[in-house]
A protein has these predicted regions:
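N-terminal leader/auxiliary helical segments
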Residues: 1-83, 88-202
Length: 202
């Protein structure tokens, strides 16, 4: 996806997640969403699931199992969350997959069309959504398995721009929601521990 498409996705997520702490650091979130395209490695490493999945996993760990919960949601947290959305969105962009056999020019033409279609798609009323009230994922392993499973399903679908839009929004929204839910659950446990309330009461 092009940078403007990543920003469109980041704004959609910000508006639909409705997380106050995330909104306070939205600039860091937006920067993170385009950061992988601003690094020198962008010229040598494709943003495909085959090339960058280990990087994605490390990014997820940075704001889950390896994160200092006492800091709360910070600019660091939001920047890395933005980076996660970038890699995920690219995995579900047709030219970023090995099954794409087109030229660089065809790659650029596809992403240009995606830019305009995606901008309209995230503004449609039917695309808006609410956060999951019951935790669907309880660990990063479950999140990772979900990403892999969904990508396999994606590879078997018709490769058209609208399909990309739907997969990108659905997958990225669910993953970001899951990461935030893990954060919120860990914060609740930390607060209860600080208040000396037994964890068993959760």
């Amino acid at each position: 996806m092009r940078k403007k498409s990543h920003i469109s996705l980041a704004k959609f997520l910000m508006n639909n997640m409705k997380v106050e702490d995330l909104n306070e650091h939205k600039k860091a979130f937006y920067i993170g969403s385009i950061l992988p395209d601003c690094r020198p490695s962008f010229l040598t490493r494709k943003h495909s699931i085959d090339a960058t999945f280990p990087i994605l996993i490390e990014e997820i760990k940075k704001i889950t199992v390896d994160y200092d919960m006492e800091q709360g949601i910070t600019g660091y947290y939001c920047r890395h969350l933005g980076v996660i959305t970038h890699y995920l969105a690219d995995y579900f962009t047709f030219p970023h997959n090995s099954i794409f056999q087109g030229s660089i020019k065809e790659h650029c033409v596809y992403e240009k069309k995606l830019k305009f279609t995606f901008k309209s798609y995230v503004q449609e009323e039917d695309t808006q959504r609410d956060r999951e009230q019951k935790g669907t994922f309880h660990s990063i392993d479950e999140i990772i398995r979900f990403i892999v499973k969904t990508h396999r399903e994606y590879l078997m679908t018709l490769k058209v721009v609208k399909e990309d839009c739907q997969f990108i929004v659905d997958l990225v929204y669910k993953v970001v929601d899951a990461i935030l839910q893990i954060f919120e659950l860990n914060m609740m446990k930390l607060n209860m521990k600080n208040e000396q309330i037994p964890i068993e009461c959760l």
